[in-house]
């Protein structure tokens, strides 16, 4: 092949790639347009509006606390909101101190008001319960430690009668996500944008953070003669253990290292912090190692106290004291947290990234523990935030952000499913126990005897049509239904040869009842098959028979012409 032929081939190849890329752009554009239309159809559906109104009233009446993307969205000015209510249904996540009962109560409310296909069930994550109405997931209710729930409720933002998690807690959740490179990093861009918007409208501000005030506060809090006399020796011993065991500093010494990026007057405050906060995969052993090493250096009156966990947020941790003075807090990481390594006087130290430190400190604000001083902790957060903002593009040393090196075990979906499988084997003979329901709740309000008077409900034809439209949209939005629809299309030829009418695909027009009369096979069996395919629930879940009949009556009733 000469050079001319090669140039021609390259040109042809370039043209092919150009047209393929243009076609891909057209495809994406069409998908976006259809997704927008579909979202608007669902959001504007009168039945869906009723469903959301019932949910919001429930959240208000029960004084539950919203969190997550919808919470961030709803506390922002309308011009900055990233969810448009006329185009998307709000995806409410909220905390409860009694999540399983609240999920069942919400399901009962929907059932008693005549909504179809209502169910409450356990989510993938233990302690989270989902409520479904009309084939749509409407709410995620998450169990929260009672003290933490009370603290969030006390500090919550009230808007339109609904409680939203305080901005610092919402901020904490986003810093936590950005500090876990072993987690779902595909969400990082979205989370980062939302964090920046929240920081603009709800700045991280603290009061009375002058170094002199805090110097006195620290001294009054825990003055100990032995500690003051042997402070340097104690700190050197702990630093040596941390370096040797490759632990991660998340406070105390980490703050001192970060203080080099502050002004001199601010730096003086951070240098006065007397204790260490460490991440260790074996915190009990680390606490004992610190105690033994201190005792070898003739430091006496050392105690270790076990501190209770905050489920899903903070592990059981250990406080090491010299007399009355805490010298170290050792935590087991619940995820894989990012850190950077630096060399100081010939020793390698692992220091948490600012994102990791912020995720811990902002949680401490609401932990309601006497050993966390909220005012001092908030000041630390403000200083760290300032450092990060002033050095946001520097990616060296301690300032490297979004580090891929992390410490701890990150749970995967597979880990969670394996844990649920183990729990099922353990509890499968105790299906009526409370523990089984906490893990595997599947609540159908129709089976609740108290709901029997509400089973018969009269509905207008308009309500029936709107429910049918929602049912169709739900089928299309479900990936399983789409896959089944594709399988149906591929099987059409084979089914025609056998003179069997295929089950309607959720992607194809639904035919009238008369078109089924010509089928030689048993009509009753076909109808059972279709009903089963339209159902997204267990056989015991109530179906709206009027909706199912309508799906046979309406000709050419497809999502595209709703």
Question: Locations of the language-model features?
Answer:
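N-terminal regions immediately upstream of nucleotidyltransferase
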Residues: 1-50, 158-232, 470, 474-511, ...
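Conserved catalytic core of two-metal-ion nucleotidyltransferases
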Residues: 109-150, 293-338
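Active-site and adjacent loop segments of nucleotide-processing enzymes
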Residues: 59, 138-222, 326-478, 485-488
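Hydrophobic, Leu/Ile/Phe/Ala-enriched alpha-helical segments that form helix-helix packing faces
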Residues: 54-59, 106-114, 237-242, 290-298
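Compositionally biased low-complexity segments enriched in polar/charged residues
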Residues: 1, 63-71, 75-76, 85-88, ...
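Residue-level detection of beta-strand-connecting loop/turn positions
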Residues: 8-15, 135, 324, 346
């Amino acid at each position: 092949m000469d050079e001319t032929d090669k140039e021609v081939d390259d040109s042809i190849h370039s043209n092919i790639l150009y047209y393929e890329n243009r076609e891909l752009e057209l495809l994406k554009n069409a998908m976006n347009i259809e997704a927008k239309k579909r979202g608007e159809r669902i959001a504007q559906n009168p039945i869906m509006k009723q469903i959301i109104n019932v949910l919001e009233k429930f959240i208000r009446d029960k004084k539950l606390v919203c969190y997550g993307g919808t919470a961030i969205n709803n506390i922002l000015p309308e011009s900055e909101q990233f969810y448009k209510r006329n185009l998307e249904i709000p995806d409410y996540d909220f905390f409860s101190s009694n999540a399983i009962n609240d999920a069942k109560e919400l399901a009962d409310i929907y059932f008693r008001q005549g909504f179809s296909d209502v169910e409450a069930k356990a989510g993938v994550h233990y302690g989270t319960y989902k409520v479904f109405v009309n084939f749509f997931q409407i709410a995620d209710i998450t169990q929260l430690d009672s003290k933490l729930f009370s603290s969030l409720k006390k500090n919550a933002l009230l808007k339109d009668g609904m409680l939203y998690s305080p901005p610092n807690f919402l901020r904490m959740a986003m810093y936590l996500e950005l500090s876990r490179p072993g987690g779902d990093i595909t969400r990082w861009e979205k989370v980062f944008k939302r964090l920046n918007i929240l920081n603009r409208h709800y700045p991280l501000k603290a009061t009375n953070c002058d170094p002199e005030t805090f110097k006195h506060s620290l001294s009054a809090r825990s003055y100990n003669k032995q500690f003051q006399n042997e402070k340097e020796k104690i700190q050197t011993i702990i630093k040596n253990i941390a370096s040797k065991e490759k632990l991660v500093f998340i406070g105390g010494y980490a703050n001192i290292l970060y203080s080099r990026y502050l002004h001199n007057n601010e730096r003086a405050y951070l240098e006065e912090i007397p204790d260490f906060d460490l991440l260790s995969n074996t915190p009990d052993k680390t606490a004992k190692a610190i105690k033994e090493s201190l005792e070898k250096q003739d430091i006496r009156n050392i105690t270790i106290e076990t501190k209770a966990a905050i489920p899903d947020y903070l592990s059981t941790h250990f406080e090491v004291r010299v007399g009355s003075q805490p010298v170290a807090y050792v935590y087991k990481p619940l995820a894989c947290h990012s850190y950077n390594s630096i060399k100081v006087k010939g020793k390698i130290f692992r220091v948490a990234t600012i994102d990791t430190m912020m995720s811990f400190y902002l949680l401490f604000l609401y932990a309601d523990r006497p050993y966390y001083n909220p005012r001092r902790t908030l000041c630390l957060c403000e200083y760290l935030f300032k450092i990060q903002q002033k050095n946001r593009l520097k990616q060296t040393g301690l300032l490297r952000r979004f580090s891929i090196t992390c410490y701890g075990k990150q749970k995967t979906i597979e880990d969670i499913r394996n844990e649920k499988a183990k729990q099922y084997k353990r509890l499968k003979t105790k299906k009526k126990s409370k523990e089984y329901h906490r893990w595997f709740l599947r609540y159908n309000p129709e089976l609740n005897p108290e709901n029997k008077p509400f089973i018969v409900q009269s509905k207008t034809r308009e309500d029936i049509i709107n429910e049918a439209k929602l049912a169709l949209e739900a089928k299309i939005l479900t990936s399983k239904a789409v896959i089944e629809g594709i399988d149906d299309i591929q099987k059409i030829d084979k089914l025609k040869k056998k003179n069997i009418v295929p089950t309607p695909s959720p992607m194809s027009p639904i035919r009238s009842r008369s078109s089924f009369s010509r089928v030689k096979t048993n009509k009753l069996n076909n109808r059972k098959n279709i009903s089963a395919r339209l159902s997204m629930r267990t056989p015991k879940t109530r179906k709206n028979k009027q909706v199912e009949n309508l799906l046979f009556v309406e000709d050419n009733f497809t999502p595209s012409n709703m």
